[in-house]
Structures are given as C-alpha cells and as structure tokens.
Amino acid sequence: MSVRYPLLNRELGILGFNERVLAQAADPQVPLLERLRFICITSSNLDEFFEVRMAGLQEQIRDNPGALTPDGMSLQHAYDLVVERAQRLVHRQYTMLHETVLPALEQEGIYFHAADTWNDEQLEWARRYFLDELLPVLTPIGLDPAHPFPRVLNKSLNFVVELEGRDAFGRQAVMGIVQAPRALPRVVRMPQALSGFEHGFVLLSTFMQRFVGELFPQLVVKSCNQFRITRNSELFVDEDEITNLRVALQGELPARHLGNAVRLEVSADTPAHIVRRLLEESLLDEKDCYRVAGSVNLVRLMQIPDLVDRPDLKFAPFTASIPPVIANAPAMFDAIDDGDILLHHPYESFQPVLELLQQAAKDPSVVAIKQTIYRTGTDSPLMDALMAAARNGKEVTVVVELLARFDEETNINWASQLEAVGAHVVYGVVGHKCHAKMMLIVRRVVESGKATLRRYVHLGTGNYHPRTARLYTDFGLMTADQKICEDVHHVFQQLTGIGGELTLHELWQSPFTLHPRIIESIRAEIDNARAGKRARVVAKMNALLEPTVIAALYEASQAGVKVDLIVRGVCALKPGVPGLSENITVRSIVGRFLEHHRIYYFHADGAEEVYLSSADWMDRNLFRRVEVAFPIRERKLKRRVIAEGLSVCLGDNQSAWLMQSDGHYRRRRAGKTLRNAQLGLLAKFCS
C-alpha cells in the first residue's frame, strides 16, 4: 500500500501529550500533592524526550540535513518548531509551580525555605548541616589551564561559581564548578520546631547558593548558579560485531552519561556571559538553553508527596480486588482449569500473577517455566519466584530484554542472578527487542488415569512489574487453551533457538504476522462497509505512528467505516478531515493512572473480534520487536474488554481530550452526567 496521506509530527505530538499531563497539575479537582507530582512527571518525561527524540533529531540534522521528517517538514524546521513549543511548555510548568502549586502548599503547611527567609536559628542550623553533611562530600573545581572545564554527567546537578581574588598559589580566580554527587539528598527536611511549618524543606541548591563560599576560602563569590546538561542517552551496540550482548552492553552503559549534549538548563538569573561559556563548553546553541525560574530539575520534588503524611492531599488509597474464581480456588491451576481468567490492572490485583508463578515454583508437578522480562524493577518478587523455581529443580528459561531503555543495568543484574541459580537466560533476538509479555508453565497432570503434560499461559499488555501494575492500566489473560499455549510455546522456540518461522494459529506475532493481520482486519471492515454492512474499528494504544496502518484507517473512513481511536500519547493520524478522515475520532485519556493497555476491536460483521497486545501501532513494534497480540474468545471476557477497556473511555467526559485535525487537543465538555473512566472502574472493582 503506497503511503500518500498526511501525517502529524511525532515530536510535537509527544510534547502535546506532556501538555495534557501538565494540565492535570492545573486541575483543582486533583489533590494538591498529586498536582505537584504531575509537574514532576512532566519534567521526567521531558528528560527522556530530550535524551532520545531531540538527540535523534540533532543527529539527523548533522548527518543528513536535507532530509525530511515523515510528516514532510525539513529537519531543521521541525527542530525549530519543537524547541519553540518545548520552551513554552517549560515556562508554563514553572509558572504553574511558583504561582499556583507552591503557594497552595504553603497554605497547607508545606513550605520550601529560601535562604533569604531564614532567621538566625534557621541560618545556624543550615550552616551546621552544610558543614557536617554536605561539605565533606563536595569537590570544588577551579577553572584554569591546569583544570579544564569538567565533563558534566548527564542530568547531574552542577553549580557554576563566579569568583574574584587570588588563591593560595597566587592564581587569579575567575570561575569554579561544583558538581553535586548523586548520593547527596536533593531535598532536606528542616526540623519542625525551627521551620514553623508542619513540613518545612530546604533544597540542596539553596544550601549550595548560600554557603558555596566555604568551598572557596578567602575568595569573593560574585554569583552562584545551578545548571544541568541533558545528553544523548541512546546506546550504540554494533550487532554485526558483538559476540556477547551482555558484555557489550556493560561496556557501553558508562558512556551513556557522557553522550553529546542536547539541552542546557540554567537558573533564570544566570549572568549572560556565564550562559555563553556553558553553551560553548557544551557545543550547544542559544536555542538549546532553557532558563528556568527555580530548580533546574523538578524531578527532585517527586519525593515530596511520599515525605508528607497528608492523605487528604493525595489520591484516595484503594485495595485492588481479587476475582472470586481465584479467591475461592484451592490453587491457581485449579482456577485456570475452570476457564480463562481476565485480570484488569490496577483495579484487579496483580497478586494472582505472582501467586501463579510462586505456586509453580513449589509445585512438584511443574516441570518447566518460560518467561519474558522487559521491565520488572530492581526488587521484584516475580524474579525471586523464578530463581526459587530454578533452585527447586524446574527447567526455567527466561528471555531477558537487555536493551529495555533505561532498564539495561537492572536487567543485566537479573540475568546474572538467574544464571547463578541455574536458569537458562537468553537475550532474545539481536535487532528485535522482545517486548511480548508471556509466561508459560508446563505441568505434569493425570487425565483419565494417564499422566500427561498440560500447559498454562499468562499473556499481558503490560510488564511483569508489580509496582507499575498499580499505576498503569493493563489487561492480563490466564488460560490453559491448548491452541494459545501451543502458539506461545512456538514463540519461545523462536526466541531461544534457531529455525524458520513457525505457523501460529491464534496469536499474531511481530515482526511476522501482526502488521499484515491488522491491515487485513481493517480491509475486511472496508469491504463490509462497501457492501452496506455495519463496519467499525476501535483501537486503544499508547501511540499511533505507522504510516501504512494510518493509510488503511484513512481508507476505512472514506469507505464509511466508523473508526474510534483511543491513543494516550502521540498520534500521527489527522482525524476529522473532510473527504479523508471525517469518520475517525481520536481521544486521549489522561488521569490518575497511565493508560497502557493495547486493544484492537473489529466489528467483523457482528462476530466482534477482540485482541489484546503489547504492541502499539508504531514501526518499531510492528517490524523491529517481538510482540504478540492474543484473541479474547470467551464471550463474557470479550464483553468485559469492550466495556472496561473501550466503552468507558469513549464515554469519558472528564479526563478525555479530543484531538483536532491540526493535531491540537481540547478537553471533552462534560454533559449532564459526569463520566470518568478510571474513577468508574475504581468504584466498580476496588474498596
């Protein structure tokens, strides 16, 4: 299929998503400490955006300046538009923090003490803290021919100090650099008796700016300003040269902190000549400098909601439910034997997934366990269960994706621990990240008086990560359906062995059948619409970028297919364009939880085909990753997925944003009845 249809810019779409996240911080219906958290989440998202997307744009401009972006802009023009919008977003973020959120926190007894507000007792406490806890760890670097400008680590907190006078060796002091080690706390609690507030805090940068002169004795400090450099964090691994992926990665990881600079953040009051020097040392242009009114890293404030015991200023706690079929069963295998089980996280607990693996590790009837791991965290009971299974003599095989961005080191550590207890560890297929979420358990059972091997499978849309399972919306399926189990077995064969493509009967798998099946399903809806039948596509995902899928959706709209897309993040498709996409709607749900499940619905002339998947409709997921989409066949479970995963989002009029044909979003206006997808599901499932 030739792609001749218009697309929207990816980078601008990512910034648009972060604008929607930041809008949560402005919503008075969101608890105050959660509003602060949304500001911090925006900062964290922007860090990754610059480390990956902006770094990639800069590289493309250097390597191929005449090239065009997929949406048809010159690279430089696209870069300039993205920088302009990013600057506006950062300005809005800091304005919201200082003019709205921090004053509201102060009214609630949560206060950040600036140095110019300290009384004598507070000043003495701060001085002692600096001298006792901070000074021994800090290393000042004076800049002169013998001390060149240091290589600043990625996203580290640094201070540039303008000096006057001569040092002990008679050298004229001009400038110094102080790097704040990551071991130092970024936020320090002031004793309540001194603070006068129930929760008083002092930022590390406040200590530094007030007492930095202690690091440069007998010199005059003319100015002290914080700065932060963001670097290209993509890892380069030559797939043709490596013989051991883990060893190659271990050699590359330290270099991540020293990649090419892509962004400079400085406090707004930094003198112009200092900014010029920092830009020169970083090989950056003026447009790459972000002057901020306050701390250069708002992510450091993410810990405040956890440090402040004010439940009234946070989202209400909830207890995820356990389905009765699991709660009433003697063991997980008995529950699955009774029929397929659908889990909807975070509303339903992730604990049954852990219990399935933990019971398998101890069950003498279990002979083998196979598992994929993409992200699981540094302290994972799931990994503990896999290691326990290996120690108990089970045949344990784990496909660990070492190239899961920013989790490489964690996954390398888990791979080493698994190998140490005798598990088989493989790293998937070089060149194709393993993003599929699969667990396969093989158990010896007696059926009709005869011993046989029975397979059990868990498939999911999200990671095997107990912490994010309480923060992200995802579906998981537990089944003993032997066709699905056989397909999962074949996928593991491909990941761990070498051989030709195996035929799958139930699963769609990238990079082989997933993309063709999606296109075929859309084309079937087009054919039905042209035949005068009802036709509909509803899809939910994190991102929609793949051009041929977008082209198929445009053609579907022109044929009269009703297309509803629920895309949380970036979407390159233009909805609502007359003659092109007037039958397509795109909405984004942004709320308490991160919308994460991927759902594909096709009306299929009334048969209603529903697939769950780990894959977004992006080039990388469809062609450069190992992904699976799995069908929901059981009628009751299918109705649940449609109702809980799709219909509630389409009906949401509180947390939904509707995409306009120019790529901008507007909030959906609430009707007479307020409907919030996430709150409704919390009320349905949780106590």
Swiss-Prot record:
EC number from the UniProt entry: 2.7.4.1
Catalytic reactions on record: [phosphate](n) + ATP = [phosphate](n+1) + ADP
Organism superkingdom: Bacteria
Catalytic residues identified in the record: 435
GO MF annotation, one: ATP binding
Keywords, comma-separated and alphabetical: ATP-binding, Kinase, Magnesium, Metal-binding, Nucleotide-binding, Phosphoprotein, Transferase
Annotated binding of ATP, by residue: 45, 472, 568, 596
Keyword set includes Metal-binding: yes
Gene Ontology biological process terms from the UniProt entry: polyphosphate biosynthetic process
Any GO CC annotation of this UniProt entry: polyphosphate kinase complex
Keyword Transit peptide among record annotations: no
NCBIfam families, sorted: poly_P_kin, PRK05443.1-1, PRK05443.1-2, PRK05443.2-2
Function: Catalyzes the reversible transfer of the terminal phosphate of ATP to form a long-chain polyphosphate (polyP).
Name of the protein in its database record: Polyphosphate kinase
Gene (name only): ppk
